[in-house]
Amino acid sequence: MPTTVIEGYKFRFYASDRNDPPHVHVLHDKNEAKIWLQPVVVEYSHGYNSLELSRILKLTRRNQNRLLEVWNGYFSK
């Protein structure tokens, strides 16, 4: 499962995500959020407060192209 660490948050996706639109699971401690990449929106969040979620969305937007490249590279195999 490809994982990209950005400012302490693990952005990852799973092989079973292949049939879904591009997204990442963002993990930190025991918290997790699922973020769609096109457009960048929250699908769900467990454990993050609104400030943390806002930061995660900002990081996702800032790294959107990079995350999409990893997604496309992984699932084009």
Regions found by a protein language model. Give the residues of each.
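A general marker of short, structured functional hotspots
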Residues: 5, 9-10, 40, 44, ...
